[in-house]
Amino acid sequence: MRTNRLSWILVLSVVIFLVIINTINASDDEERLMVDVFRGYNSLIQPVRNSSELPLIVKMALQLVLLINVDEKDQVMHTNVWLTLQWHDFQMKWNPVNYGEIKQIRVSPDKVWLPDIVLFNNADGNYEVSFMCNVVINHKGDMLWVPPAIYKSSCIIDVEFFPFDEQVCTLVFGSWTYNENEIKLEFVQAELVDVSEYSASSIWDVIDVPASLVNKRSRIEFQVRIRRKTLFYTVVLIIPTVLMAFLSMAVFFLPTDSGEKITLTISVLLSIVVFLLLVSKILPPTSSTIPLMAKYLLLTFVLNVITILVTVIIINVYFRGPRTHRMPQWVRVVFLQFLPKLVCMKRPKSASERSAVRSGMAQLPGVGQFTLSPSAHHPLCPSADDRTTTIRNTASNETSAYYPLSTDALRAIDAIEYITEHLKRDEQHKSFRDDWKYVAMIIDRLLLYVFFGITVGGTCGILFSAPHVFQRIDQQEMLDRLKEKYDTASNIP
């Protein structure tokens, strides 16, 4: 039993010893390889034997990891990417057999020559990568460097269809000191941006990611085509603005004598000003085009200002009277006869018209039999017709023996005549005022229809003029399609 235990301990010790020996040998081989490879190596010299090997081919790829932010006001795109750079260094070659079958090594980037590929259109002054990772070198002299980077690149923002806008932002890479005769750029695989590790943004959808070589293959342009997700702006900006546009028409429903017409229009106007300030803070102050949302807010603002002016005119018309204004005949024809039929309004009958109807009803058969005859009146209480005749006769002959009246009675009759004339005049003035009020009501109803048509037409014409209003994008499906496109292009020789 004790012999078996000692045997296991001996075997385990031998295995551990061999592992340590192999590790030491591997470390020795790699250290020896590093010494041999970098003996006489100068990292400042471009890795070409002579000028006949120029230009040096540098292969490049870009992998989009995260779209951090797109600042519309400052016109800057903030991205997290992985760069891939490949080139050949003839000095970095060795035979793996001589170095323990080591086929690749990793070295610090300051030990080898690196192509000075920088982002040309950076927006923060940081041209280089943010983390200097190791360079992977294989035994054939092929160099691979995959540094991560966070870039802020300039991006010209097209705000014409905001918030239904698409943007095309470009990242331009190239050598800072070498010209097109010294370095040529190529793609590692496909002429696309790799989105296999991309994390979807909550604000933007990635539509396409093409790439191209420009300036005699001395630069590479990677394009990121993105489309804004509109749910947030629809709820926060578009729907309230549309509701305010239609709310401004409610002023034509309010009675003019309520005194709230101007209050409502001013309140809506102030709300529109607040939304205009909100849009101006989001978008860049460009003069090349007017944003879609700004156009709609401007239309609503202008309509509201016109509503205020028209409301003032309507209030002025509503409170006109016969002592200050006389209604022209054309106004009476247009606003009291023609337009009521056009806007489907019917004027209620006045008190005098209702009296005329009642008096007409008195002439119907069977109604006149209840009318008292003049002979039914008491001699001292004559009928209205007899009273008129009596008054006239009394004026010419005060000693009429037929109907003798006292002086007080004559004064009372004069007072009644004065009151009657005054009531008739008031009724006539009231009729004139009612005509002006009805004209104001007609203008209210007509402008309600006109402004409703303009608001509906403006809303549909402006908001629906964007080319992608009703298009919904499945971001995951789009990314899968771009990945498949990238893999297909990579497999093409």
Curated annotation (Swiss-Prot):
Keywords, in A-Z order: Cell membrane, Disulfide bond, Glycoprotein, Ion channel, Ion transport, Ligand-gated ion channel, Membrane, Postsynaptic cell membrane, Receptor, Signal, Synapse, Transmembrane, Transmembrane helix, Transport
GO MF annotation list: acetylcholine-gated monoatomic cation-selective channel activity; excitatory extracellular ligand-gated monoatomic ion channel activity; transmembrane signaling receptor activity; transmitter-gated monoatomic ion channel activity involved in regulation of postsynaptic membrane potential
SUPFAM superfamilies reported in the protein's UniProt record: Neurotransmitter-gated ion-channel transmembrane pore, Nicotinic receptor ligand binding domain-like
InterPro entries linked to this entry: Neur_chan_lig-bd, Neur_chan_lig-bd_sf, Neur_channel, Neuro-gated_channel_TM_sf, Neuro_actylchol_rec, Neurotrans-gated_channel_TM, Neurotransmitter_ion_chnl_CS, Nicotinic_acetylcholine_rcpt
S-S bridge residues: 155-169
Gene Ontology terms: cellular component: acetylcholine-gated channel complex; neuron projection; neuronal cell body; plasma membrane; postsynaptic membrane; synapse
Protein function: Non-alpha subunit of nicotinic acetylcholine receptor (nAChR). Involved in nAChR sensitivity to nicotine and levasimole.
NCBIfam families membership: LIC
Protein's name according to its UniProt entry: Acetylcholine receptor subunit beta-type unc-29
Protein species of origin: Caenorhabditis elegans
Designated gene of the protein: unc-29
